């Protein structure tokens, strides 16, 4: 397809003349059939809803086709409308547009659907089993058409993948405002999502899937590296001061979990990651994100022993069920140093977790046709997995929950994961590592994408970012010196670690000062021509301010506000009028539907003074909103960080907490009994 044909296809939107039906491509990793949940009347409504995108002349043909999709897959994806052109992040100049910001958003959307990047590209799922960009291909086509027509004085409203339309606004307003799976709180249970998604009225956007900010497994690998490195440091003794030879065991080689083996190798440990889906394991192996594939535990166990003995930095994928792996490690008394889990347990009944003793294929069939039996198998599997993990922790393994709802779903299954006082016996990684060491000080997963598509532009941004962090490090207080040192090492090594999958993007944990100064350095480089095209700034929603999640991002908030969502909602509103190019707010993401509220942003910078102003105003709020909230929760690191920010930033005044003597309070209560 020529560039002109590609651009014409984008501008056409939903074509008046329907394209030919497309065969089901079995070479692509597809989503499993979804649960059959709709009543006969609701099935009528689902098809009626889908036909809204098409003129009546096509309804008879498409109604039959959509009914078949609903029967076979549990959803209406409109495969017929999947474009013929290759899906990937093109250089920004190749997108037809009236507004440069809109072209950047088109680039980001296509990256999320690139088959090298997305988990189930033909079902518009980027990662996590159900993290959707759109619900169907009509929504994709119509959205791209709107973006190609958008001016600097319009804003596109996106309702769970549905483009509501272009509305008049102004150049400083966001070009796109995204909401995903925002529902009335009483209707936020898993079956509510299944029903609403099957009806075509809501979608689970995960975090960066539905907000057009996913950058492949690199997007989580820096945070995973930080986590593994600091978990390993918890195992250090006077005689053991490095991670070499340590064994790290976990599961998952999907869009997010696929970062684990690379993070383990960067950290210097032996990583063994189980993955039940052969296509997912093969994909990560071909991309170089995992070093070895093993299909037999009889072969894997001796290989693990040798790698640990020889202190290799190596990653291995076990293509099989993680419970079999844990039980074998426990039975063989293999000394595991670090353990975690990244199965998609936010989505346990629809492909996020595969039970032991049931094949991958049989599980996919059972979850759709016998959901009650499948649930029983999953819960029994979780109980067995926890039993094996408990045996290994009794021998010294440090196990942490990776914020995927593992402990939550294991507890619901009756597994032995509860400790004293009704608390989980194992910490989340945010409680032990990410929260007190990073989020409380404002460090989080800042990221950027070079819209030129040129590797040399990305190399320059790496150098600029490293220079900024090194300058900050010279006068940094001791309490954040270690974080800065790790992040400087990361960005200096990023190119050599071959992290790019999809767009020319980079992830870097940075605080408010670092993010702002790095972005300003990029903006100057665009202005003087050293960078050849605009840069998109963004972050994961898994950040200082972006997510309220009591089992993950806000699990180290202990003042009782961990169940509130004011921070995430305030954050997206504040970003929207301080300069974000697009903003998003989601229900779910990470731990699951009904358990989280999270949001994010994208900002296109183009070398202008307007971009510099937006950088200063928006990035300050985007980080310090969360620090202020964490400070009010009496987190010591956050109190220190917000005091420094108030000294640095004129006009910033934050309410600080006063410490109360808990023993005094207890005595008062006793006196009043």
Residue spans for each PLM region:
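Small-residue-enriched alpha-helical segments and adjacent helix-cap loops
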Residues: 535, 539-570
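Long, compositionally biased, glycine/small-hydrophobic-enriched stretches that function as flexible linkers
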Residues: 1-198, 202-217, 371-521, 525-538, ...
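Short, solvent-exposed amphipathic alpha-helical segments in soluble enzyme
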Residues: 265-267, 330-334, 415-418, 526-527, ...
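Glycine-rich beta-alpha junction loops
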Residues: 278, 320-323, 342-347, 403-409, ...
